[in-house]
Amino acid sequence: MSQPPTKRPDAETRRAQLLDAADAVFTAHGVNAPLELIVAHAGVGRATLYRQFEDRNAILLALMERSVQRLHAKAQSLNAAPDAFFLLLEYLAERIVRSPALSDYWRSTSLHDPRFAPARQMVAETFMPALERAQAHGLVRSDVQPRDIPLLSGMLGAALRGSSDAERLRLARQALSIIRRGLAPDAV
């Protein structure tokens, strides 16, 4: 994934502030919300936003990269848990429910868009050890591959159809249950 150039600590802090603000604004108003709302929410000037990000797409890409980095950190925190694969899917479902606009944007991107290839690759690499452990422990069918992760993510994304946080959470849990049963070795 693209790494921003090394910045001064205060610039890094402002970048994180802007990303937090963008996540909150996009969650509340969608990814097409005016960028001025992000500036106001972050409590910075418009010039600060544009020093950090050239446009809306740069903000969205940075949010996606941050989301993937957090997924990777979550995977590492699970160490060698046999059910880490399903715990990662649960974490992904929670993120989808908490950031529906970003999740919807992520799902709408082309699988062939080179800007998102590093993020997609990191997701696959993040899930691979957990998938292999789950398969070794008989929790997941042997024919499930990392290339299936975007499909599973899309199934979890169906939770976005809920009209409230509670309904989205219920739908995400239902999707997780269906996925778990469908991936079980005895489901074939």
Locations of regions flagged by a protein language model:
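Basic, helix-initiating cap at the start of DNA-binding domains
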Residues: 1-32, 36-41, 58
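Helix-turn-helix/winged-helix DNA-binding modules
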Residues: 30-31, 51, 141
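Short hydrophobic/aromatic patch on the recognition helix
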Residues: 43-53
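Alpha-helical DNA-contacting segments of helix-turn-helix folds
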Residues: 53, 57-67
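Hydrophobic alpha-helical connector segments
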Residues: 62, 72-98, 112-115
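Amphipathic C-terminal alpha-helical segment
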Residues: 98-103, 133, 150-169, 180-188
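Short linear capping/connector segments at secondary-structure termini
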Residues: 104-113
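Amphipathic alpha-helical packing segments from all-alpha helical-bundle domains
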Residues: 112-154, 161-162, 170, 174
